A protein has these predicted regions:
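Extracytoplasmic/periplasmic, Sec-exported soluble proteins
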Residues: 26, 46, 50-58, 91-94, ...
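A structural "domain/chain start" motif
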Residues: 7-84, 186, 190-201
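Short, solvent-exposed, polar/charged sequence segments at loop or secondary-structure edges
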Residues: 73-122
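Hydrophobic core residues within well-ordered beta-strands of beta-rich domains
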Residues: 110, 133-135
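Outer-membrane beta-barrel translocator domains and adjoining extracellular loop/strand segments
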Residues: 125-130
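A short, structured loop/turn motif at beta-sheet edges
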Residues: 23-27, 103-110, 141-151
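Short secondary-structure boundary motifs at beta->alpha junctions and helix caps
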Residues: 142-194
């Protein structure tokens, strides 16, 4: 079971904040397709992932993780069709647009809005520890149709390098270290956030 401070391991951190009881709001959650934060780090760097691909991946991972917790959702594609005429720049700023629409037209009791701030794969075929994979994303849950902010969580993890070694010890440490991909890190974050969300019921 996860605490509200961090997930079960002490290296994959999730910070969560509850603003009001959220139990009834989890009856049917509409998941908004994630978007890239304006400070997104990924495609601007070697080893980076284009923001449209990163947001698509994280949206899918979070959706599947929430479903695995037994929480009913409004399918992402159904949500996207319902809001296809809403200007994206406006909608991500004003969650009220999502909450009202999802609550009144899709039967949602809440909406989950997410943004990806970093989605970067490791760089360097032989020494990825110098530039390890790193992922940051955050989610906010709003009550539908009223739009009240209920809960938020932020996941931030960069794989640390192995302990400093020298000579043959360095080679052995590199072989023992499993260099995570951004996809693997994001999966851990999605599962941790979904677990926290389920615990908050």
């Amino acid at each position: 079971m996860l605490s509200f401070a961090a997930c079960a391991t002490n290296t994959h951190h999730v910070d969560a904040q509850s603003y009001a009881p959220i139990g009834p709001a989890l009856a049917r959650v509409a998941i908004v397709p994630f978007y890239a934060h304006r400070l997104y780090e990924g495609s601007r760097r070697l080893g980076g992932v284009p923001p449209e691909l990163a947001t698509q991946r994280v949206t899918q991972q979070v959706t599947e993780a929430i479903l695995a917790e037994g929480i009913e959702i409004v399918p992402v594609d159904e949500f996207a069709r319902a809001f296809e005429d809403v200007p994206r720049a406006t909608a991500v700023i004003d969650a009220q647009i999502y909450a009202e629409g999802a609550g009144n037209h899709l039967g949602a009791t809440s909406v989950l809005v997410g943004e990806v701030l970093r989605y970067r794969d490791a760089r360097g075929a032989t020494t990825p520890g110098r530039h390890p994979a790193s992922v940051v994303f955050q989610v906010t849950l709003y009550e539908a149709p009223d739009g009240f902010k209920l809960w938020s969580a932020r996941y931030d993890y960069t794989q640390p390098p192995p302990p400093e070694k020298s000579g043959s010890d360095l080679h052995d440490a590199a072989l023992m270290q499993h260099w995570l991909t951004a996809h693997e890190i994001a999966q851990r974050g999605a599962e941790a956030i979904a677990d926290l969300l389920a615990d908050a019921r």
